Amino acid sequence: VLTAEDRRLLQASVGKLGCRLEDIGADALNRLLIVFPQSKTYFSHFNLSPGSKDIVHQGEKVGKALDSALKHLDDIRGTLSQLSDLHAYNLRVDPVNFQLLSKCLHVSLATHLRNEYNASTCLAWDKFLEQVADVLCEKYR
């Protein structure tokens, strides 16, 4: 459960990013495909070259979904419901990939925020990303 302090830290860190969450999503997706190559199976129709237009576009979708969830912290489930349906019923993404992407998002955030990505901020993002992953996985049950 996100505390008031977690929410404050999330909002503050987004304000300090110096880029859009869409850029963070694109960077994290690039990292995911390099570090966890098994995730490439879901993107066989994409140009998987690092920084390709396909990867950037898909990563921007990740960032937009996170941005939307951050704007609706009291209703992450409702906000991401359609995305959860898409991943569970249509794309059939292995749920472990949400955790792997979360790890890559942490690295991307830390890279952009540097010293601002301290233990408290990291914990707030970890709680948030765990909630997002839980929502995206719940339709698999």
UniProtKB/Swiss-Prot annotation:
Coiled coil: none annotated. Keywords: Heme, Iron, Metal-binding, Oxygen transport, Transport. Heme b binds at residues 58, 87. This is Hemoglobin subunit alpha-D. PANTHER family: HEMOGLOBIN FAMILY MEMBER, HEMOGLOBIN SUBUNIT ALPHA. Residues 1-141 form the Globin domain. Pfam families: Globin (PF00042). Belongs to the globin family. Heterotetramer of two alpha chains and two beta chains. Involved in oxygen transport from the lung to the various peripheral tissues. It comes from the Eukaryota. GO terms for cellular component: blood microparticle; haptoglobin-hemoglobin complex; hemoglobin complex. It comes from Drymarchon melanurus erebennus (Texas indigo snake). Disulfide bonds: none annotated. InterPro entries: Globin, Globin-like_sf, Globin/Proto, Hemoglobin_a-typ, Hemoglobin_oxygen_transport. GO terms for molecular function: haptoglobin binding; heme binding; metal ion binding; organic acid binding; oxygen binding; oxygen carrier activity; peroxidase activity. One of its GO terms (biological process) is hydrogen peroxide catabolic process. Red blood cells. Transmembrane segments: none annotated.
